Amino acid sequence: MSLKKRIIAALTALALLILPLAACGGKGNGTATSDAPVTDLPDTRIDLASYTIVRGERSSAYVTNAARNLRNEIKDRFGVEPAISDDWLTEGDYTSERVAALPEILIGSTNRPESEKGAEGLGKNEWRVSTAGKKIVISGGSDIATGAAVNAFLGALSGAEKTDGGLMLDLAGLALSGTSETRYLVGLTDQKNSTVRVCDLAGGSVSVADSIWSRKYEYYNIADTRLREYNGREVVLAAYGGNSASMVSFDDKKEELWRTDLTASNPHACELIPCGVIAVAASTGGEIRFFDAAGNGKTYVAEKLEDSHGLLWDPAAGVLWAVGRTVLTAYEVTFDGGKITVTERRDLRTAIPSDWAHDLQPYYGNTDRMWVTTGSAVYVYSKSQKKFLTDYPGAAKIQRKNVKGIGNFEDGSVVLITPDGGFKTWTGRDLDFYAADGGSYLYISVKSTDGGFYKVRAWNKNYQ
């Protein structure tokens, strides 16, 4: 080939090489292009079948049950059963990358750092569901709130996709939060701080700072309180000191509407009877005294009852129930023309199976029943059978000696207090709460850092 032909061939090849490069410059047809490689978005789906549900080694029965319910619900709905365990680790694993990479659903407070991070800033009734790497973090400001977070996560599983042997869930955007609407209000006689306080058990603690409402009393040994209604206003009754009782408005004013310093010695219970009479039972004095709720607290009618400790008005039967040392009895009370008349219903008088009766409270949800506690047992009394029952729902967990105060909520959950000797030999600092869940009664210890409680009341103005 001649030199001229070789030059022409080289120029032709160069032109063929330049043309596609020019096209890549984006000016050939006016359409913008990119030389970056085209990639798919990252796959944020995970297989729940490979995950382990983890709860704290020392978590409450309530949280443990929430973790178990999560596993069972996933199994029932999708036929996939995740593993479940507590958070126990060997010492060297607490900060290891191996544990951080484990696919886990963390329930409540665990020893994983992701749990602490997930709960940051939560109020006592608030909850959150978040993700951190391969971790799904379910957090609550209290055990009750954690249970609400588990339920919210179960709702999010509606978007899960069942595959062969797996359950795919997209973690993208899995960020849920809310506030638990569950409330368990209690009234507490805090003898250490000389106050009646109202707190919400759902928050998990009943320290002074947790009080929704409180009133300080000038005397010691507040022995009883309850919420009632008088002349269209919600009121708080209290028995306290050596010979005192009062009724104040349940609002910010805390207005004293009635008071006496003439109860029998060591008042232990008080009750507002709808006819306008306030009854106060005193243990050492061995009397129940009946006062005009609109009066000056200086005149009364008295009925003897040895070691009288508890009172409860029964609107259905129209009687005031009372417990003394070894007896449950009832009284008809009328108030006509300024005169109080009290008559014991001897036909309702019943011997209590054990000694030293202490508390008497409504069994909300069943008007035939009442709680009765003694120095050695917790009973449910059936009015129709005239029997003290020990086989009531939850008895296996609730039954014990020396219960100073007890009550239940309309959903069946039960709260009680026993002495721990921290302040006085007869007071306790923490409450035992049993959350009703079907046939189960799931234990939660409700803590206080600064209380000394004698009685606890389900905060309900209804008599039964």
Regions inferred by a protein language model and the residue ranges of each:
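Short coil/turn segments that connect the beta-strands within blades of beta-propeller domains
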Residues: 182-184, 232-234, 275-277, 316-318, ...
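Sec-dependent signal peptide cleavage junction
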Residues: 20-37
